[in-house]
Amino acid sequence: VSAMCLEALRSFGKIAVEAVAGHSLGEYTALYAAGSLSFRDAVKLVNLRGKFMQNAVPLGEGTMAAILGLDRNIVNDICIKASSKGTVEAANINSPGQIVISGKVAGVAEASGLCKEAGAKRVIELQVSAPFHSSLMKPAADSLAEELNKITIKDASIPVVSNVTADYVTSAGTIKELLIRQMTSPVLWEDSIMKMSNDGFDTFIEVGPGKVLTGLIKKINPKLKIYNVADAATLGDFLGSWHPGQPAEAAR
């Protein structure tokens, strides 16, 4: 869906996209936008990736929780302490004060309790089928690596900001390596947006259903201009306010 929204946007020929980024699964759309993955390969990889993650940990053994209102260093320290009960790690650094943890049910439960004691505003257990972006996804990462060897990954035509490093990447070889590492690494979304903001990017377009990333970006830097293109109505709104040739960063 995100790729189709992107193509609808491109068909008007008004946008000079200078970099792209995607959150977790959305990184595949970003790589498609940058010409690194074909649409066919991106869809294939996304489908296989989901299956590999489901098979990595038996259903019911892993979970995730959102921690609101605590500094990331505190959350990381708590995860280390709670890991005595079971694997638990930071999985998504989404925005200031919004961190998702992932791991074994007992480890996440222990960390959630400690986060509440440390003053977290809210701790929300997420309804997920697996502990994504944790070391428990190593079997899934290994399976994905095998599939990546079967497809063609091209150098990106524009910089892609990696979830793993929060830095620009264009090399096909590095992109492949980072897609594998992404399975077991935290999504550094806050760091990615700050990197681009510090480098002068001031306009972002969220492409695809929903406004989750728009909300996160506003929390990271309220001064940034953010647009959302999710359907015909929002596409029309965007085209009515956009200035041709204006540089942008596409997020999904």
Predicted regions: what they are:
Residues 33-186:
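Alpha/beta catalytic cores of group-transfer enzymes, especially the acyltransferase/condensing modules
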Residues 27, 137, 250:
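Alpha-helical and His/Cys-centered functional microenvironments
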